[in-house]
Amino acid sequence: FDLDNLLISSHFEALKNIKSATLHREFINLLSSIDLDVENISSDMLYFVIKKLYEMGEIEKAYKLISKINLDSVDIDKQNLEFFYSIKLNYLYSSFKLSEVCNLRLFLLEQSINLPKNLLQKSDIFCLTLENKFSEAKLLNSLLIDSETVKDEYFQKLFNFMLSSENNNFFTPLINIQSKDLVFLYSAMLRINELPLDKNFIELDPLNLSIPVILSESTSMDIRIKAAHRAYEDDLISINSLSALYQSVDFSSKEFDDPDKTISNIDNNELVMAYYYQLA
C-alpha cells in the first residue's frame, strides 16, 4: 500500500463522509493494513493515516498501528508524537485497562510529554487516587486548577466524588461533553465508581463507548437500549445480545395489560421495540 503526501493531504478530507458501508469498511481495512517500513513511509504519512482512523472512530486500529512503531527510534515530529501517545492513552481508557493507563502515564511523565487538555496531568491525579495516594493527588489537583484557564468542571466533579467518604452520594450524570480528548478519561472514572453514563457518550464516540454504556448497570435502561441499537448497527453486538437486553427491560404486568396506553407513554423508540419484543 503506497501513499504519497499529495494524496494524503489533498483527499483524506474528502473521504470524511463515506456513505457506502462496504466502501467504508474497505477504506478502514486499507488504512489499517499499510506497510510501516520506516524507510518508505514518513512521519507525516503515519500521522495522516492514524489521524484519519482516529477521526473515524477506529481507535483500536489506530492504537495497533502506533504500537508497531518504535516511537523512540523513529524521527517523529514532537506534535505528532504527542498525538500518538494521546491515542494510546485514550485507547487504554476506552478498553478499561487502568493498570496499563497508569504505567503509561508514568513513562510519559518521565519523558515530559505534553498531551491536550492536561490529559496527562489528570491521568496522574486519577491514578494516584486509585493508588490511595490522596494527599499527593489533592496537591497536584490544586496545581492543575491554578494552571487551567478554564476549569474542567467534569473532572473536578468526578475527582471530588472519588475523594468522598460517602459512597452513597447523589451524582448527577455528566451531560453535554464536547471534548473527545477527555471523554475516555471521564468514562473510565465513571465506570470505576459505578456511576451512570449519559447518552452524550454514545453521541460523541459510538464505536468505542456504546459497549461501556450497555454494560453499565448504573446507567438508565433507556440509554443502555439506545447504546445497544447503535452498537448493533455498527456490528459491535449480535442480534442475540440485543434481544437479551430487550428481555432485561423491566415492564410491569399493568403495562402489559394496556399496550396502547403503554406505548403512547413511552417516549423512547428503542424502549418501544423492547416492549414489542416482550409482548410478542
PLM-predicted stretches and their roles:
Residues F1-A280:
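Alpha-helical solenoid repeat scaffolds
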